[in-house]
């Protein structure tokens, strides 16, 4: 099973025929019909079909698999600087209908939530939530449908948004764990300017609890999805 994300829909691509890389890929048209009488046509390889696995999301960004095997997805609502973002759990995959039976709102009213990541410390699981102006982690337990206890904020970032006179671009914050370190990307405030904040256009390295923060890389316009 392979998953594709297109626009604001999650699409499921299932293979019924093995394709060989050395052979030319033959494409076929497949009509797609979504809720709200939305229709369009996609081209898919012969032997594949494509289907909407989940509908109704606004601006989905990144997936993360939880320790108990569920799929989390961030939704930034739209391209504006807003606090209407949500985190969804896509649960109950139905192999017959090729859809998720349950779409659960895990968190809402978030400030441009671009990405979440899971990490285990001392035998306990945590979910890290990256918003424009802050990074927070929450305890996570199997089967949670909302944070089980208050979160701990471990970092802050420039929060000027699109109204910032220097540009205010790059509202997203991306996360990655490696060798027990957490890496966070903070994009530049503009395409070409002298930055006001040192943290702009960098990747920041820190311990999973937020301690020992340092600049890991500089001069990166926007390392989204690092």
Question: Model segments located where?
Answer:
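Bacterial Sec-dependent N-terminal signal peptides
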Residues: 1-23
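Beta-propeller domains with acidic blade repeats across secreted/periplasmic ectodomains
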Residues: 22-226
């Amino acid at each position: 099973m392979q998953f594709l994300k297109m626009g604001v829909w999650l699409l499921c691509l299932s293979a019924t025929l093995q394709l060989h890389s050395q052979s030319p890929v033959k494409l076929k048209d497949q009509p797609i019909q979504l809720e709200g009488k939305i229709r369009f046509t996609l081209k898919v390889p012969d032997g594949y079909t494509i289907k909407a696995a989940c509908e109704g999301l606004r601006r989905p960004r990144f997936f993360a698999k939880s320790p108990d095997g569920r799929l989390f997805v961030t939704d930034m609502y739209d391209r504006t600087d807003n606090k209407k973002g949500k985190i969804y759990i896509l649960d109950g995959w139905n192999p017959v209908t090729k859809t998720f039976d349950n779409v659960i709102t895990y968190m809402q009213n978030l400030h441009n939530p671009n990405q979440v990541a899971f990490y285990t410390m001392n035998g306990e699981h945590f979910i890290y939530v990256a918003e424009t102006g802050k990074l927070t982690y929450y305890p996570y337990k199997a089967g949670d449908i909302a944070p089980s206890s208050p979160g701990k904020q471990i970092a802050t970032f420039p929060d000027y948004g699109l109204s910032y006179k220097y540009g205010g671009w790059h509202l997203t914050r991306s996360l990655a764990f490696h060798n027990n370190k957490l890496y966070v990307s903070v994009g530049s405030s503009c395409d070409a300017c002298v930055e006001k904040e040192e943290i702009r256009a960098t990747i920041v390295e820190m311990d999973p609890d937020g301690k020992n923060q340092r600049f890991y890389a500089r001069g990166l316009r926007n390392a989204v999805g690092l």
